[in-house]
């Protein structure tokens, strides 16, 4: 990893290397106009962020429709590119940092991208999740590359993840790599293996010794209904579905190497917002050894229809129902998946 992979808060760095990433820095006037607009909407809730998630969602939708376009037309145009699937991520800086509107700002930005939602467990029914490093615990310098909800069927998995910075120590960052440019550089044999149902994923909530919690043979790479290259990667253990597989280790090593070449890393400081497509790329986080990082995380989808099919209106949905598979073989537990210790992981 080199400095060329870093996009700075001032929008520095070689951004021409990352045409899939849209960036925008609010002017001082746009910052103030957006702050005033969000304050105005919280007047209707006695100046406080509503506790009811349905009211939170409604307030954020109204604020997204009204405040962003009026306060920062350039940012609104960038978000339209997100909604049209023209970019895989956006990095926005110089946003308001006033504590009283931070939750609303987080939801407003994500609501401008899609419908904000969450799963009822293990996130305690909150739309805005606090992601913080714990200085009292030993931490890994970098987490593995991953997609979130890899075990959740595609039409119920989060499409977009939003991260709004609240506090951040220098040296901490989030990295993202879209899979399309990575896939284009892979060798034909690696690509064939990754697109074929050759891997098994282990459930993140089950012990490694439990063979029944390995998925059926599934592909790591796939094509969306619109033809986009997509990836599912749980960040936990993965192994070949067949014990005699001789290609998988090399294919995954090649994939990991190309991700390291194609990714971008950004510092999510206070007033910075990163949103990225969870279906079309992988991400990871790294915290400085003596640092602290706090950001607000949100999930969004273009449509919640598949999540609502069981009768739940949302925006909080049962994780058990969302994870329940219909006919997608990638989500079935498979008693005949190869036994043994995990063989493959993608590392930085």
Per-region residue spans from a language model:
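A gly/proline- and charged-residue-enriched helix-loop-helix capping module
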Residues: 99-140
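Active-site environment of non-heme Fe oxygenases that use a 2-His-1-carboxylate facial triad
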Residues: 1-66, 85-90, 124-270, 276, ...
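N-terminal functional module of multi-domain proteins
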Residues: 69-116
